Structures are given as C-alpha cells and as structure tokens.
Regions:
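Short alpha-helical segments that sit at the start of domains
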Residues: 1-16, 74
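N-terminal low-complexity or simple alpha-helical regulatory segments
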Residues: 13, 25-28, 52
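Nucleic-acid-binding surface
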Residues: 20-23, 52-128
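Short acidic, hydrophobic short linear motifs in intrinsically disordered regions
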Residues: 23-36
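N-terminal, charged amphipathic alpha-helical interaction modules
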Residues: 31-32, 46-49, 60-61
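Short amphipathic alpha-helical interaction segments
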Residues: 37-52
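Catalytic cores of nucleic-acid endonucleases
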Residues: 117-169
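Charge-dense, extended regions
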Residues: 173-175
Length: 177
C-alpha cells in the first residue's frame, strides 16, 4: 500500500515535470529544478527517468525538450521563465501566452503578464499590449534599461533585465508609473 502511494507521488511529480518541459521547451536543468523548490534531488532523478523513457531529451546547449521537438529554444521565453521563477512560491498557476506576452501567472490573487521587448520592438509591443486590456499587472523584460523610456503602455508593474545566468534586475519607470 505504501509503495503504491510513493509510486503515485513520483508519477505525479514526473507528469508535472513533463508538462513544464512541454510548456516551456529549452529550459535548463537549473530552471526546471526551481519549479520544484526543496525537491531538487527528486527532480534531477525524474529528469533522468524521463530522459531514459525517451519522453524528453537534453540538447547540446543543455536545454530540455519534449521528444520530437526541434531543439530550438525561444530565448525570450527562457528569460520570461526566470521572472516567473522569482514568484514561483506564490504562483498558483502559470502558462505560456500569445505575443507580445510570453507567459502569464497568478500570484496572490493577481494576474501577471510577462512580456519581452527586444531592441527596436518597443512601439510594436506597446501597440499590441494596448489592444490587450485585461486588468493584469505587466512585467516587461527588456534587453537593456535604456529601452524603458521608450515603452509607454498601460498596466506596467515594472521592468526587468535578465542576464544569461538568470539574474533578474527590476526597475520602475521614471516618473513613478
């Protein structure tokens, strides 16, 4: 009886991990372990298990992908996931989203949208966000803080940059909005 329960728990964790790899293809092991706070050894074992089963594979650059996917990571999504991971303890729900938003999550009763704005895309993304009124809080990922002055759209909670190794740095817009 006890063994079955343990296998079920393990199975649930494996299914959750597989779902995460499928929703956000290309995440590193470090990112995937952050989805399972306090259970990194279990999560590591499950990644190996899913890999041996042929359900997922690790690309040359270290990202994990579902079987059958081409190993091309969406760098903007990977940056947005680092932002999500800052809130993962409070996040009740998260999912990838449509352009210009990369992902959405619920935390503390609020809906957050994480959008990415590449250099030169400020006007385009703002235009897309204006038509996208949802009463959510928006976190805008930028390549550099110099872009912030060019971004003017509603419901922005803050801006951030994300380094290659996943360090997030948050900024408020000048003028306190």
């Amino acid at each position: 009886e006890l063994m079955k329960t343990r296998a079920e728990i393990y199975g649930n964790e494996a299914a959750t991990l597989l779902r995460t790899v499928t929703m956000y293809p290309g995440l590193s092991q470090q990112q995937l372990l952050c989805f399972h706070p306090g259970k990194s050894e279990t999560a590591k074992a499950l990644l190996s298990h899913l890999e041996r089963q042929g359900r997922i594979f690790q690309s040359d650059n270290g990202g994990y992908f579902p079987a059958g996917y081409s190993p091309k990571a969406d760098q903007a999504l990977i940056k947005a996931v680092w932002v999500l991971l800052d809130f993962i303890q409070q996040a009740d729900y998260h999912a990838p989203a449509e352009f210009p938003v990369k992902l959405v999550f619920f935390a503390d009763g609020e809906l957050y949208e994480v959008a990415y704005v590449a250099h030169g895309q400020e006007a385009l993304v703002c235009h897309a966000l204006r038509g996208n009124k949802g009463g959510s809080r928006r976190i805008i990922v930028v390549d550099s803080p110099t872009q912030i002055a060019k971004i003017d759209c509603p419901d922005i909670s803050g801006f951030c940059t994300v380094s290659q190794d996943g360090q997030t740095q948050y900024f408020k817009k000048a003028g306190g909005t």
